[in-house]
């Protein structure tokens, strides 16, 4: 080993990527991009078979580093707001009356403006609108009150008027002094009470809030008051176990501070991550593989062994004719070095990435390359037993190459006794008649390759991630051993290597046997490093589950295709020699190693939110078939994806699998029960619970057609008229009598339209002063206020669309029920100069559309009822209290260098 410390002479750089013993540096994200490019080339070959000639698919390779940065940004986002003043829930419209005003629930007013207009023939737009409305509820109600403005009144702490959630300042100027005093007395009674929540002092007061918004606020407050202490202990305890496995210490700096009495803390994410959530995503095996590489794989160098090993074994003679001696001085090209990367990726992800030989006409002409690859391939790869690094075809090609090498007797002739089968390696060699059949690949037992007579998969102490309990032991090496490259590997060996040395000696290849004997310590260090990388750094939620891992090899042999098929990468013959002569030596651990659990938790949480959204949307077609006549499951899949964070979509679609996901994949995923608990998921489920009543989303199927005259009152007493606060609306206080309602379904409308009697039938119903309800289709409802005559398209608008045209001598009719409906409020304003008939027209104005929603959107109230909506209990944290999101503490860790790195 002293030769390694000798002063080496300067070497001329023949290639830009060769520098001494170091060939190149590869980091996790860099290797993930490289792996993604190579994998995509294989995936595209399969995907191209499914593409039609006109279908365009974007096959650009995504930027993995940018995706990870976006997910980290997503983890820093808060799903709640910390505010001093809650949003206004009720506002008032001043009328000419001194004791009456219109009270408007601003939630319904704002909700009516969210989303697009629903139509029957655009189900994707309907699903997208529902998602937007549910998101509006969640975001509107996700607030925490902190340091609310208060004032002192006679020694009592009283809430400022803007905290109460009612806007009434525009009403005060028109009130009498008596009414203003009454409101002031009510405001002075808004006393702040001292409360105690989770051993923390808080302010409690009564305010106003709309029901759906308050449900979200109440759920968020309950989440905080539940303290999440056990969840935090579980997360920190699990991080400790993970840190021990991955050699990471997680900082307790933040956690020593949050227990103070002046701190309110919120834990928005939880650990450990439920791996089932990540692996249930359809066609996600490749995306998870890339994420595993990007977040966990260390940066490393490709180190060459001591050059004296080959000089004193393979090239000691002046003339060298052996295949090994010929290749000893060769230098890899850039493409061959890429193949070396593929080989080490396959070794680090056994079973998930397997290798095959690429067809290279140039190398078929050089038998020395094939022979050498046949020998080193049996020492580099595992083919069977529990997993494989090779395809069956490549294993057979390596067997044939080893067969040719053993029979290539360039030094001395050795006796050969051939077997009866004609299979590769079916012969015995040497004086002791060594049976070479044992080196022929057998995927059932692993014979002939590294897994031969070796326990290369072990289950021992429980791993932090429950889905991946296996420990990989290439060459039988235990990854818990500490590696000192100067001494490690000396005196170590394993069965396949011993048998290879015996067979080479029996074949008369003494120089090569001496070379491999000298390379054994370097070879053992190589696989010891790989074992440590697999069992420590690469252990994550993106690791392949044990049940899938155990099924990879049997499925490969049987030709069965499952959810996680292996990725096959092509390598050249000569790259096996270069891979054998290079070892991947980790130099720096992955930059994202300590924050990987947080990235995983964010990703799983967002997937759970998407799954909950899809479950509810999948029920829509059964609840409202009239508005989703043409709906397919792919529509709500696309709607949820469009409204999901870009980073999460990018991870799910790393291999462009979304272009090929079918309905079976989607529905299977939606129905699977696995979810990742988080604050965002809790609030999303509560928002859907609030949205189960579609009237809270300003959608209704209670829309009627009825001819009604717009009121034109005589102004005999203007003062009395003004005091009554006269207004008109097409909003019904109750549905019409059922015996006066004609249910006009699509089938009835089509029949009448075919007979050319659709308009006549409706006219007859209107003349009888009856009502028509057009199907059970949901409609988008808008709320508008007018203090003058509304436009005719609102006053005389019909709750359906009916168009006729003629083409080719035939008459066609188009009927649509899902149109936008407007609830309007017309406030009458008069002046003392008006005459009694100022509002009277010769011809009356008719309104045709009536709407019934069982919600108090707008109501006329007396002045004394302005504050009657103060009926919600609010909890506000005092200004001197700190509200701290301790989610970020789950990533505050420091990587420990391996003792020998």
UniProtKB/Swiss-Prot annotation:
What is the first-listed, main subcellular location in coarse terms? virion
Q: What does this protein do?
A: Inner capsid protein that self-assembles to form an icosahedral capsid with a T=2 symmetry, which consists of 120 copies of VP2, with channels at each of its five-fold vertices. This capsid constitutes the innermost concentric layer of the viral mature particle.
List the molecular function annotations (GO) for this entry. Answer: structural molecule activity
Q: Where in the cell is it found?
A: Virion
* Additional detail: Function inferred by structural homology with BTV-fold inner capsid family.
Tell me the InterPro entries matching this sequence. Inner_layer_core_VP3_Orbivir, Inner_layer_core_VP3_Reovir
Protein name in UniProt = Inner capsid protein VP3
**Taxonomic lineage per UniProt?**
Viruses, Riboviria, Orthornavirae, Duplornaviricota, Resentoviricetes
Q: Name one Pfam family in it.
A: Orbi_VP3
| Keyword check for Oxidoreductase | no
Family the entry assigns: Belongs to the turreted BTV-fold inner capsid family.
Tell me the SUPFAM superfamilies matching this sequence.
Answer: Reovirus inner layer core protein p3
- Keyword terms of this UniProt record: Capsid protein, Inner capsid protein, T=2 icosahedral capsid protein, Virion
């Amino acid at each position: 080993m002293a030769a390694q410390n000798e002063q080496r002479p300067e070497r001329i750089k023949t290639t830009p990527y060769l520098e001494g013993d170091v060939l190149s540096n590869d980091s996790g994200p860099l290797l993930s991009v490289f792996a993604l490019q190579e994998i995509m080339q294989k995936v595209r070959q399969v995907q191209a078979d499914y593409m039609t000639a006109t279908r365009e698919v974007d096959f650009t390779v995504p930027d993995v580093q940018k995706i990870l940065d976006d997910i980290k940004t997503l983890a820093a986002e808060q799903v709640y707001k910390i505010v001093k003043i809650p949003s206004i829930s009720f506002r008032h419209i001043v009328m000419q009356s001194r004791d009456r005003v219109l009270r408007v629930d601003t939630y319904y007013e704002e909700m009516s403006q969210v989303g697009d207009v629903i139509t029957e023939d655009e189900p994707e737009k309907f699903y997208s609108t529902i998602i937007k409305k549910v998101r509006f509820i969640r975001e509107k109600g996700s607030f925490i009150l902190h340091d609310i403005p208060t004032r002192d009144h006679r020694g009592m702490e009283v809430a400022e008027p803007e905290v109460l959630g009612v806007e009434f300042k525009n009403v005060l100027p028109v009130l009498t002094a008596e009414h203003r005093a009454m409101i002031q007395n009510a405001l002075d009674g808004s006393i702040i009470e001292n409360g105690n929540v989770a051993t923390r002092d808080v302010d409690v007061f009564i305010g106003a809030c709309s029901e759906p918004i308050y449900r979200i606020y109440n759920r968020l407050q309950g989440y905080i008051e539940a303290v999440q202490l056990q969840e935090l202990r579980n997360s920190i305890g699990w991080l400790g176990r993970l840190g021990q496995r991955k050699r990471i210490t997680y900082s307790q700096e933040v956690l020593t501070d949050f227990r103070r009495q002046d701190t309110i803390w919120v834990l928005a994410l939880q650990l450990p991550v439920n791996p089932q959530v990540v692996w249930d995503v359809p066609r996600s095996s490749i995306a998870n593989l890339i994420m595993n590489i990007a977040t966990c794989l260390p940066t490393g160098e490709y180190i060459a062994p001591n050059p004296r090993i080959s000089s004193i074994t393979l090239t000691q003679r002046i003339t060298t004719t052996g295949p090994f001696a010929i290749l000893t001085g060769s230098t890899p090209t850039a493409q061959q070095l890429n193949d070396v990367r593929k080989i080490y990726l396959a070794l680090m992800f056994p079973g998930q990435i397997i290798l095959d030989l690429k067809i290279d006409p140039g190398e078929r002409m050089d038998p020395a390359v094939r022979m050498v690859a046949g020998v080193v391939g049996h020492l580099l790869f595992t083919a069977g037993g529990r997993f494989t690094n090779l395809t069956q075809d490549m294993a057979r090609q390596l067997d044939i190459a080893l067969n040719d090498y053993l029979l290539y007797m360039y030094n001395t002739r050795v006796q050969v006794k051939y077997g009866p089968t004609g299979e590769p390696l079916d012969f015995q060699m040497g004086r002791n008649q060594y049976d070479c059949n044992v080196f022929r690949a057998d995927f059932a037992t692993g014979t002939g390759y590294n897994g031969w007579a070796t326990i290369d998969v072990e289950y021992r102490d429980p791993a932090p991630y429950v889905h991946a309990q296996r420990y990989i032991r290439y060459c039988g090496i235990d990854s818990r051993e500490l590696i000192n490259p100067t001494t490690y590997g000396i005196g170590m060996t394993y069965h396949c290597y011993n048998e290879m040395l015996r067979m080479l000696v029996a074949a008369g290849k003494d120089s090569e046997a001496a070379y491999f004997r000298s390379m054994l310590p370097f070879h053992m260090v190589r696989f010891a490093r790989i074992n440590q990388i697999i069992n420590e750094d690469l252990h994550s939620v993106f690791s392949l589950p044990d049940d899938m891992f155990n099924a990879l090899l049997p499925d490969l042999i049987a030709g069965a295709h499952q959810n996680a098929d292996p990725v096959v990468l092509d390598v050249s013959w000569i790259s096996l020699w270069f891979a054998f002569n290079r070892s991947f030596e980790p130099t720096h651990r992955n930059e994202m190693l300590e924050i990987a659990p947080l990235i995983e938790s964010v990703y799983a949480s967002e997937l759970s939110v998407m799954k909950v959204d899809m479950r509810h949307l999948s029920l829509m077609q059964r609840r409202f078939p009239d508005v989703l006549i043409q709906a397919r499951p792919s529509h709500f899949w696309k709607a949820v994806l469009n409204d999901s964070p870009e980073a999460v979509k990018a991870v799910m679609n790393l291999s462009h699998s979304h272009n090929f996901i079918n309905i079976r994949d989607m529905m299977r995923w939606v129905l699977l029960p696995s979810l990742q608990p988080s604050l965002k998921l809790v609030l999303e489920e509560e928002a859907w619970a609030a949205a189960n009543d579609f009237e809270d989303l300003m959608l209704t199927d209670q829309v009627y057609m009825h001819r009604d005259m717009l009121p034109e009152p005589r102004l005999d007493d203007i003062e009395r008229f003004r005091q009554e606060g006269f207004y008109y609306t097409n909003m019904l206080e109750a549905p019409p009598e059922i015996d006066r309602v004609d249910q006009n379904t699509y089938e009835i409308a089509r029949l009448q339209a075919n007979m050319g009697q659709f308009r006549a039938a409706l006219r007859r119903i209107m003349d009888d002063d009856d009502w028509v309800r057009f199907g059970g289709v949901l409609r988008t409802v808008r709320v508008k206020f007018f203090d003058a005559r509304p436009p005719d398209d609102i006053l005389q608008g019909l709750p359906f669309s009916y168009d006729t045209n003629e083409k080719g001598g035939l008459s066609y009719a188009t009927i649509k029920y899902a149109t936008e409906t407007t609830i309007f409020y017309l406030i009458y304003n008069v002046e003392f100069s008006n005459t009694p008939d100022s509002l009277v027209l010769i011809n009356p104005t008719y309104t045709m559309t009536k709407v019934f929603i069982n919600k108090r959107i707008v109501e006329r109230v007396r002045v004394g009822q302005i504050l009657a909506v103060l009926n919600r209990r609010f909890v506000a944290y005092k200004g001197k209290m700190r509200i701290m999101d301790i989610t970020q503490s789950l990533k505050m860790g420091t990587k420990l260098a391996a003792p020998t790195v």
